[in-house]
Amino acid sequence: MNVFEPRLSSWLENAGDDDDVVLSSRIRLARNLKDEQFPVYEQKEEIVDNIAEVFDDNFTLIKMNQISLLQKALLVEKHLISPYMMNKSEYGAVLLNEEENVSIMLNEEDHLRIQCMTPGLRLFDALEAALQIDGYVEEKLSYAFDKEFGYLTSCVTNIGTGMRASVMVHLPGLVTTKRIKSVIEAIRSLGFVVRGIYGEGSMPASNIFQVSNQVTLGKTETEIVEDLTQVMEQIIMQERVARTTIKQKFHIALEDRVFRSYGLLMNCRIISMKEASDAISDIRLGVELGFFEHISRQKMNELVLFSQPAFLRREAGRDMDELEEKVIRAKVIREILGDK
């Protein structure tokens, strides 16, 4: 297993429900050990070793103090660790399975953060996988748990189930029709959070948004997932309606925009992250509307992931200035699109 190779994790490679709009679903469970201090201010490496002993050879342990900053950034770009772990978790670690659809962060904000990812809108599948791992760990180790408040976490907003359910969606239709602001406001009014592609503190790129629950106390895991699934079904419906409206009312203008973006990415020699993200979103929309038969959703995910800064530094084999990064990005994008 070489997680640092430029390849997609299984949840970005395989097909899933409603994957014309939904890229992926994720369940994250935050847990702390009963007799250990948290929040994890003074991290103890022995906590990592004790937890890692619970898992078999199906998981690979990667310690943050044994890999480079570039390798940490690659894990962030693949959504396998958080930016917090990359920047602040000296004695943190991550356990990964071969498919890279299970990521267990150790010594992040909490002692354990179990993440399970699935393609498309499959929150219940992700929940089932996460709870199975959680139950296995709880048989071996004692969690910090309160009968009144539930699972105790470093951040009070996670107390209760300790669960964050999130869905990554591509919403170019709602952005183009200028309905995205009202949709986001409606989502927030229902108690959910909308963030960028890399979660808290990140900005949307390629018209990709992350929608997650805010409430973890007073509801069961199943109730939270049911609520988020219902919200996502409404968003999916509205996005599909917006796409149909654009195609019917502005067909030539839309086709021109999509093929201009395709021409740009196929021929560019220098391209910024923002310009690439906008063009990739246009082409992904074109793929979903049937303009391109030779481009798969998998290839679109490759364009998003492998045009990120850390993967470009890996491709170049060195650090780069801003211009060099734009040149390498253009080269990588041309190679991905040209590989039919």
UniProtKB/Swiss-Prot annotation:
Superkingdom assignment: Bacteria
Phosphagen kinase C-terminal domain sequence ranges: 21-242
Gene Ontology MF terms in the entry: ATP binding; creatine kinase activity; protein kinase activity
Coiled coil stretches, renumbered: none
Catalytic activity: L-arginyl-[protein] + ATP = N(omega)-phospho-L-arginyl-[protein] + ADP + H(+)
GO CC annotation: extracellular space
EC number: 2.7.14.1
Keywords assigned by UniProt, alphabetized: ATP-binding, Kinase, Nucleotide-binding, Transferase
Protein residues bound to ATP: 24-28, 79, 113, 164-168, 195-200
GO terms, biological process: phosphocreatine biosynthetic process
InterPro entries in the record: Arg_Kinase, ATP-guanido_PTrfase, ATP-guanido_PTrfase_cat, Gln_synth/guanido_kin_cat_dom
Function in brief: Catalyzes the specific phosphorylation of arginine residues in proteins.
HAMAP family the UniProt entry points to: Prot_Arg_kinase
Membership in a protein family: Belongs to the ATP:guanido phosphotransferase family.
PANTHER family, per the entry: ARGININE KINASE 1-RELATED, ARGININE OR CREATINE KINASE
Name of this protein: Protein-arginine kinase
Organism: Listeria monocytogenes serotype 4b (strain F2365)
